Amino acid sequence: MLTLLSFLAGWAEGWTASGRPDVSISWEQSADGRPKQAAWMSVQGPAAWGQLTVWESGEVAVEAMSVETGELVLSEQLAVASDYELLAIIRRLVAACEV
């Protein structure tokens, strides 16, 4: 499942390279040697800011909080088995932060 971590990193780098000014995205990956590898992406948009974490096991945690009210607009814990499933979650997070 390390491909999920690579997919998240590649997607985040692609977004950043696209130069879209409306939503800012950054990402990090856990240090080598940790027993359970993970990568996470932070998203800041005009409507919300959020974070998505994916572990090599396929577990995903995603949250987004309204900039205006501080309330959660997205909060999920789930498991994915493919890049396609992870992409759908990434898109939901970005959409929540853009609106």
Each model region followed by its residue ranges:
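Short, Lys/Arg-enriched charge-dense amphipathic segments
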Residues: S42-V54, R91-C97
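Mixed-charge, Lys/Arg-enriched low-complexity segments
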Residues: M1-T3, V73-V99
